[in-house]
From Swiss-Prot:
Keywords for this protein: Exonuclease, Hydrolase, Nuclease, tRNA processing
Taxonomic path: Bacteria, Pseudomonadati, Pseudomonadota, Gammaproteobacteria, Pseudomonadales
Self-association and partners: Homodimer.
Gene that produces this protein: rnt
Function recorded in the entry: Trims short 3' overhangs of a variety of RNA species, leaving a one or two nucleotide 3' overhang. Responsible for the end-turnover of tRNA: specifically removes the terminal AMP residue from uncharged tRNA (tRNA-C-C-A). Also appears to be involved in tRNA biosynthesis.
Identification of the protein by name: Ribonuclease T
Annotated Exonuclease domain residues: 18-99
Site positions (Important for substrate binding and specificity): 29, 51
Organism: Azotobacter vinelandii
Length: 116
């Protein structure tokens, strides 16, 4: 974790931020595991916010009416191979694609209101 966190802290600093926000599909589950590992390893400098995260299950439910990763990806026009599903790397890559797709199209889908 220390090695991974070094890279995350470097990216956070280079963007002028104070903390990273975890992105995950059912992210509260992942964040709980991350926080437990941090405590177990007695890591003092966790770059991730301790209780905030972006949950693609919730965001996809709002954006596409789908909370299952495979169905949300299909609704977003992202290829999803069911044979690859549930491998940590594949699901992580698809979650990242889904998150970026939702964020990049959120305004055109009516997710932001310009009050200016």
């Amino acid at each position: 974790l220390q090695e991974i966190f070094r890279g995350v802290r470097k990216a956070v600093k280079s963007h002028g931020c104070k903390r990273a926000i975890l992105v995950g599909h059912n992210s509260s589950f992942d964040l709980a595991f991350l926080n437990a590992a941090v405590a177990r390893c007695d890591i003092k400098r966790n770059p991730f916010h301790p209780f905030s995260s972006f949950d693609t299950a919730t965001l996809a439910g709002l954006a596409y009416g789908q909370t299952v990763l495979a169905k949300a990806c299909q609704s977003a026009g992202i290829e999803f191979d069911g044979r690859e599903a549930h491998s940590a790397r594949y699901d992580t890559e698809k979650t990242a694609e889904l998150f970026c797709g939702i964020v990049n199209r959120w305004k055109e889908m009516g997710g932001w209101v310009d009050f200016a």
